[in-house]
């Protein structure tokens, strides 16, 4: 079960911060450091006491970053523009299992059949997707002793110090989270794993009609708008439109509200802005995914194509994002008279194969060809072989295929895994047919030996 931390507010008064630290400090700290009054002289007096004793410095700075800084980080973390897509903190484990149960099958009423099938089991069609923790990073910043000394010279100096420390770390974390979310969308778009619909961005009325139709379509049960191909729907209140700033500037709130059959106030709560689906910080992403063999760096042309996408309509549950760990640590370097502060961040980034999503594309999506790799293979009876379908597309057309075999003893799964029966012989043509354009297909010829 995931939980979202409560947003807590913190006054920017140094006196309040100092007293909050004192309230949870050790007995030794409280014996030396009195309660602070909200005036500059009192704060300077406390500063002199703390700066005179290294042990008090360490306890003060540790509490400042770990306790007070955590309040600031937590409150800001759940105020970012894409916060509605985050699930919260993952309380247990590092893996999330997402389960989808298909609709029950209908049966014809027949008392005669009932006599024979009363105790027959009907196993439900259950599909699962596993999402694993895949983001473990830390961020680091340094506080010099002089920074600590200066914090006690003004009424808001202590608060400014903790803000200075945490803002660097938080900004990095928030920016990276946003970049990864955009990268996930880009990867699913370029792989053809999001349903697409052509939209005329040069005509606002036409665009509004197309978006309204898409929103209405999601209200009905369908298997066309999610990666797993399960039959599901998305309620209006669970629909969110991610819209780039350029397209948003051409659309009035009234038009969009009409498109999604919402009041203008309701629409604002379901509209998420993005600077551009191709506005990826390639250098930063390269650092984040360094050493990851699955990371793909987009070319300039690919990023420009992504930036042409005006909007994507997603189910509230499309993104599967959990925080697992968000922890501060600090360490004093007595030789250098400074403290290093570390923010460790563990997250789970994924998307749901069962949640609906529709991308609005300014061009016409097409499938130009399908090839199967390998194109030919010799397989012994009783063995298996995994085939790969490569689907060439334009304008982010879906790349999913349907596998089929012309030999009943040589079967192929939906994932392209070929199984050769021990009694099979001869050849089998394994075909991969594009679901988006059934006129496009590729074939592998299997020879059984």
Q: Which ranges hold each PLM region?
A:
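Long, hydrophobic alpha/beta structural blocks
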Residues: 127, 135, 148, 192-219, ...
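Extended oligomerization regions of viral-like shell subunits
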Residues: 209-321
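Assembly/oligomerization interface modules of large self-assembling protein complexes
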Residues: 57-141
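Hydrophobic, Leu/Ile/Phe/Ala-enriched alpha-helical segments that form helix-helix packing faces
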Residues: 68, 169, 173, 215-218, ...
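Long, contiguous amphipathic alpha-helices that act as assembly "spine/axial" helices in icosahedral shell
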Residues: 125-197, 337-343
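Extended, compositionally biased alpha-helical segments that mediate assembly or anchoring
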Residues: 2-66, 273-365
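Short glycine-rich, low-complexity/disordered patches
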Residues: 32-33, 76-84, 178, 189-190, ...
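Extracytoplasmic soluble-region selector
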Residues: 364-449
């Amino acid at each position: 079960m995931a939980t979202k931390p409560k947003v807590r507010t913190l006054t920017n008064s140094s006196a309040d911060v100092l007293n909050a630290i004192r309230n949870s400090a050790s007995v030794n700290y409280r014996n030396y450091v009195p309660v602070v009054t909200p005036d500059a002289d009192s704060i300077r007096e406390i500063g002199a006491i703390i700066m005179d004793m290294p042990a008090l410095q360490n306890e003060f700075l540790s509490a400042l970053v770990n306790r007070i800084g955590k309040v600031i980080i937590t409150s800001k973390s759940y105020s970012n523009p894409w916060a509605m897509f985050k699930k919260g903190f993952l309380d247990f484990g590092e893996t999330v299992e997402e389960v989808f149960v298909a609709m029950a099958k209908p049966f014809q009423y027949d008392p005669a059949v009932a006599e024979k099938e009363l105790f027959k089991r009907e196993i439900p069609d259950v599909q699962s997707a596993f999402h694993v923790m895949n983001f473990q990073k830390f961020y680091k910043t340094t506080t010099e002793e002089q920074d600590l000394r200066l914090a006690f010279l003004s009424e808001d100096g202590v608060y400014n110090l903790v803000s200075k420390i945490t803002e660097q770390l938080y900004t990095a974390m928030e920016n990276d989270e946003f970049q990864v979310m955009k990268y996930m969308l880009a990867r699913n778009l370029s792989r053809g794993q999001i349903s697409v619909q052509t939209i005329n961005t040069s005509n606002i009325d036409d665009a509004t009609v197309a978006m309204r139709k898409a929103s209405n379509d999601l209200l009905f049960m369908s298997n066309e708008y999610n990666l797993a191909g399960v039959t599901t729907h998305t309620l209006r209140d669970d629909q969110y439109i991610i819209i780039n700033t350029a397209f948003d500037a051409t659309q009035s709130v009234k038009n969009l509200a009409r498109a999604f059959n919402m009041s203008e106030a309701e629409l604002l709560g379901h509209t998420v802005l993005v600077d551009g689906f191709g506005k990826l910080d390639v250098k930063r992403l390269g650092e984040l995914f360094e050493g990851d063999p699955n990371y793909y760096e987009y070319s300039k042309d690919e990023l420009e194509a992504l930036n042409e996408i005006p909007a994507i309509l997603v189910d509230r549950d499309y993104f599967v994002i959990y925080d697992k760990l968000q922890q501060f640590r600090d360490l004093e370097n007595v030789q250098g008279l400074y403290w290093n502060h570390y923010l460790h961040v563990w997250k789970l980034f994924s998307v749901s194969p069962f949640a609906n999503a529709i991308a609005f594309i300014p061009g016409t999506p097409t499938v130009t060809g399908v090839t199967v790799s390998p194109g030919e293979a010799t397989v012994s009876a009783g063995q298996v072989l995994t085939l790969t379908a490569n689907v060439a597309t334009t304008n982010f057309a879906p790349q999913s295929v349907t596998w089929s075999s012309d030999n009943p003893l040589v079967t192929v799964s939906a994932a392209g895994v070929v199984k050769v029966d021990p009694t099979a012989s001869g050849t089998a043509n394994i075909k991969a047919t594009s679901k988006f354009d059934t006129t496009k297909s590729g074939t592998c010829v299997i020879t059984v030996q």
